[in-house]
Protein backbone atom coordinates (compact mmCIF):
# COMPACT_ATOMS: atom_id res chain seq x y z
CA UNK A 1 0.00 0.00 0.00
CA UNK A 2 2.85 2.39 0.87
CA UNK A 3 4.47 1.68 -2.49
CA UNK A 4 1.23 2.42 -4.32
CA UNK A 5 0.72 5.72 -2.49
CA UNK A 6 4.36 6.68 -2.99
CA UNK A 7 4.16 5.85 -6.68
CA UNK A 8 0.93 7.85 -7.02
CA UNK A 9 2.46 10.87 -5.24
CA UNK A 10 5.57 10.65 -7.39
CA UNK A 11 3.44 10.57 -10.55
CA UNK A 12 1.40 13.58 -9.42
CA UNK A 13 4.58 15.47 -8.51
CA UNK A 14 6.13 14.71 -11.92
CA UNK A 15 2.94 15.87 -13.65
CA UNK A 16 2.82 19.12 -11.68
CA UNK A 17 6.48 19.81 -12.37
CA UNK A 18 6.00 19.28 -16.11
CA UNK A 19 2.94 21.54 -16.17
CA UNK A 20 4.87 24.27 -14.39
CA UNK A 21 7.44 24.58 -17.16
CA UNK A 22 7.18 27.72 -19.25
CA UNK A 23 8.37 28.14 -22.80
CA UNK A 24 11.64 29.98 -23.21
CA UNK A 25 11.15 33.68 -23.90
CA UNK A 26 12.31 34.80 -27.31
CA UNK A 27 15.17 37.31 -27.47
CA UNK A 28 14.28 40.98 -27.86
CA UNK A 29 13.30 41.83 -31.46
CA UNK A 30 16.70 43.19 -32.54
CA UNK A 31 18.46 40.11 -31.16
CA UNK A 32 15.91 37.80 -32.74
CA UNK A 33 16.31 39.51 -36.11
CA UNK A 34 20.10 39.12 -35.81
CA UNK A 35 19.56 35.37 -35.29
CA UNK A 36 17.28 35.28 -38.33
CA UNK A 37 19.88 37.12 -40.45
CA UNK A 38 22.55 34.60 -39.50
CA UNK A 39 20.32 31.69 -40.55
CA UNK A 40 18.53 33.08 -43.62
CA UNK A 41 19.75 35.23 -46.52
CA UNK A 42 18.43 38.74 -45.90
CA UNK A 43 20.12 40.82 -48.58
CA UNK A 44 18.39 44.02 -49.60
CA UNK A 45 16.38 44.26 -46.36
CA UNK A 46 16.42 47.67 -44.70
CA UNK A 47 15.33 48.68 -41.19
CA UNK A 48 12.47 51.19 -41.37
CA UNK A 49 11.45 50.93 -37.72
CA UNK A 50 11.90 54.62 -36.96
CA UNK A 51 9.94 55.75 -39.99
CA UNK A 52 7.21 53.14 -40.43
CA UNK A 53 6.24 51.81 -37.00
CA UNK A 54 4.22 54.89 -36.22
CA UNK A 55 3.17 55.93 -39.73
CA UNK A 56 2.15 52.46 -40.99
CA UNK A 57 1.09 50.78 -37.76
CA UNK A 58 0.36 53.57 -35.28
CA UNK A 59 2.87 52.13 -32.79
CA UNK A 60 5.05 54.54 -30.82
CA UNK A 61 8.20 53.84 -28.79
CA UNK A 62 6.15 54.05 -25.58
CA UNK A 63 3.95 51.17 -26.76
CA UNK A 64 6.63 48.46 -26.87
CA UNK A 65 9.76 47.07 -25.22
CA UNK A 66 11.50 46.52 -28.55
CA UNK A 67 10.64 46.49 -32.23
CA UNK A 68 12.11 45.92 -35.67
CA UNK A 69 10.46 46.56 -39.01
CA UNK A 70 12.34 45.46 -42.14
CA UNK A 71 11.27 45.74 -45.77
CA UNK A 72 12.93 45.00 -49.10
CA UNK A 73 14.95 48.00 -50.25
CA UNK A 74 15.14 47.01 -53.90
CA UNK A 75 12.21 46.79 -56.30
CA UNK A 76 8.53 46.44 -55.58
CA UNK A 77 8.22 43.51 -53.23
CA UNK A 78 5.82 42.69 -50.43
CA UNK A 79 8.56 41.22 -48.25
CA UNK A 80 8.27 42.52 -44.66
CA UNK A 81 9.41 41.30 -41.28
CA UNK A 82 7.94 43.03 -38.25
CA UNK A 83 8.82 41.86 -34.73
CA UNK A 84 7.30 43.59 -31.70
CA UNK A 85 7.78 42.96 -27.97
CA UNK A 86 4.76 44.12 -26.00
CA UNK A 87 4.94 45.39 -22.44
CA UNK A 88 2.11 43.11 -21.33
CA UNK A 89 -0.41 40.56 -22.59
CA UNK A 90 -2.97 43.25 -23.46
CA UNK A 91 -0.37 45.01 -25.62
CA UNK A 92 0.55 41.73 -27.31
CA UNK A 93 -3.10 41.13 -28.20
CA UNK A 94 -3.35 44.67 -29.61
CA UNK A 95 -0.15 44.18 -31.65
CA UNK A 96 -1.54 40.92 -33.04
CA UNK A 97 -4.64 42.73 -34.29
CA UNK A 98 -2.52 45.51 -35.80
CA UNK A 99 -0.32 43.01 -37.66
CA UNK A 100 -3.37 41.04 -38.77
CA UNK A 101 -4.73 44.26 -40.30
CA UNK A 102 -1.33 44.95 -41.89
CA UNK A 103 -1.28 41.49 -43.49
CA UNK A 104 -4.78 42.03 -44.90
CA UNK A 105 -3.62 45.38 -46.33
CA UNK A 106 -0.55 43.78 -47.94
CA UNK A 107 -2.72 41.07 -49.48
CA UNK A 108 -5.29 43.53 -50.82
CA UNK A 109 -2.55 45.72 -52.31
CA UNK A 110 -0.91 42.73 -53.97
CA UNK A 111 -4.19 41.57 -55.52
CA UNK A 112 -4.37 44.86 -57.36
CA UNK A 113 -0.75 45.50 -58.31
CA UNK A 114 1.70 42.74 -57.34
CA UNK A 115 -0.07 39.47 -58.11
CA UNK A 116 3.21 37.57 -58.50
CA UNK A 117 3.69 37.92 -54.72
CA UNK A 118 0.32 36.43 -53.73
CA UNK A 119 1.77 32.94 -53.04
CA UNK A 120 4.39 34.45 -50.71
CA UNK A 121 1.70 36.48 -48.92
CA UNK A 122 -0.54 33.42 -48.61
CA UNK A 123 2.27 31.60 -46.80
CA UNK A 124 3.01 34.54 -44.47
CA UNK A 125 3.29 33.84 -40.75
CA UNK A 126 1.54 35.87 -38.08
CA UNK A 127 2.89 34.72 -34.72
CA UNK A 128 2.31 35.48 -31.07
CA UNK A 129 4.97 33.95 -28.83
CA UNK A 130 4.34 35.23 -25.33
CA UNK A 131 4.81 38.99 -25.51
CA UNK A 132 6.55 38.81 -28.91
CA UNK A 133 4.29 39.33 -31.91
CA UNK A 134 5.62 38.94 -35.45
CA UNK A 135 4.53 39.27 -39.05
CA UNK A 136 6.75 37.44 -41.53
CA UNK A 137 6.04 37.99 -45.21
CA UNK A 138 9.00 36.37 -46.89
CA UNK A 139 9.92 33.60 -49.31
CA UNK A 140 11.89 32.18 -46.36
CA UNK A 141 9.02 31.78 -43.86
CA UNK A 142 9.79 28.13 -43.06
CA UNK A 143 13.46 28.84 -42.33
CA UNK A 144 12.61 31.91 -40.24
CA UNK A 145 10.08 29.94 -38.19
CA UNK A 146 12.79 27.36 -37.49
CA UNK A 147 14.77 30.15 -35.82
CA UNK A 148 11.75 30.96 -33.64
CA UNK A 149 11.19 27.29 -32.84
CA UNK A 150 14.82 26.85 -31.77
CA UNK A 151 14.01 28.91 -28.66
CA UNK A 152 11.12 26.67 -27.55
Give the residues covered by each predicted segment.
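Sec-dependent signal peptide recognition
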Residues: 2-10
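Bacterial signal peptide processing site
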Residues: 20-22
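C-terminal motif of bacterial Sec signal peptides marking the signal peptidase cleavage site
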Residues: 15-18
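Extracytoplasmic/secreted envelope proteins and their assembly/folding machinery
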Residues: 29-33, 37, 50, 81, ...
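Short, compositionally biased low-complexity segments enriched in polar/charged residues
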Residues: 47-76, 90-94
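A short, solvent-exposed beta-edge/loop patch
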Residues: 73, 116-152
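Short Gly/Thr-rich strand-loop-strand
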Residues: 89-128
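A short acidic-to-branched-hydrophobic micro-motif
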Residues: 78-88
Amino acid sequence: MKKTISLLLLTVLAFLTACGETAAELPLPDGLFTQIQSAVPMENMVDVSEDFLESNLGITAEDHDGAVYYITAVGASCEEIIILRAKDEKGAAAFYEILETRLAYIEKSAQNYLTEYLPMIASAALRKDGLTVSLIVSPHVAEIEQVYDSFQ
